[in-house]
Amino acid sequence: MSAFVITTEQVWLDKYKYDDAEKQYYENLSMGSASNKPHNSPQSAASALSNSGDGSELAARVANLEQENQSLHKVVKDLQSAISKLESRLSTLEKSSKSQKPAAASQPAIEVAARVQKVQVTPAAKEENGTGEDDDDDDDIDLFGSDNEEEDAEAARIREERLKQYAEKKSKKPGVIAKSSILLDVKPWDDETDMAKLEECVRTVQMDGLVWGSSKLVPVGYGIKKLQIQCVVEDDKVGTDILEEEITKFEDYVQSVDIAAFNKI
């Protein structure tokens, strides 16, 4: 009896229950960690995008960006080709300009050489057409010096005559005369002043460079009228102060003289 009790106590009869419980625990633990782990695979990302409305919008934007990228690549290629064409054109123009510069520079040199040759040939031709004198006499006598001196003297005389004629013509030409148009207000003493006599007295003032013009009577007030008269004067010959002094000398008729308007002509 005692032996049976000992054997039964050493056997764990409920061990399978604990094993099942432990297995279930670890299975639940592993399933929970797998569900919390993010899906990083391309298939899961594609399925997530296809299953959501935002994913379709993002896909459309990506497609548009790809199209824009392709169009930009095309534009860049066109620009590169245009730049290459311009560079080739510039190189061609530089080569052509370099080839033309020596030719253009050589043309003045050719002209100078032709002139020098002409100058050298002309005395030789004149010597060949000479009177046949000896070489020693030709060395002592200047055949062309006298002619050149006569030509220089003739040219100087003609130039002096032309300058003299120009100076005379310029001296005879009248210069610009500065003139002014003046409107004078001549005021009488009272309404009993004879305005016709007053105007007659004013017009008796005569000076070199003074020309009287039209006139009229302008009412002032209380039956009094003033004489408004126009005149043209040369600025260098007639001054306004002198003109006013000459008019105010007729003190029996003239009270004062004022300048109503002054204009340069």
Curated annotation (Swiss-Prot):
Nuclease recorded as keyword: no
Polar residues: compositionally biased ranges: 31-54
Region (Disordered): 31-64, 118-155
SUPFAM superfamilies per record: eEF-1beta-like
Family annotation (SMART domains): EF-1_beta_acid, EF1_GNE
GO cellular component term, pick one: cytosol
Record Pfam families: EF-1_beta_acid (PF10587), EF1_GNE (PF00736)
Composition bias, Acidic residues: 130-153
One GO MF term attached to the UniProt entry: translation elongation factor activity
GO BP, one annotated term: translational elongation
Keywords, alphabetical: Elongation factor, Protein biosynthesis
Classification via CDD domains: EF1B
Quaternary structure and partners: EF-1 is composed of 4 subunits: alpha, beta, delta, and gamma.
Homology family: Belongs to the EF-1-beta/EF-1-delta family.
Known function: EF-1-beta and EF-1-delta stimulate the exchange of GDP bound to EF-1-alpha to GTP.
Protein name: Elongation factor 1-delta
Annotated gene: eef1d
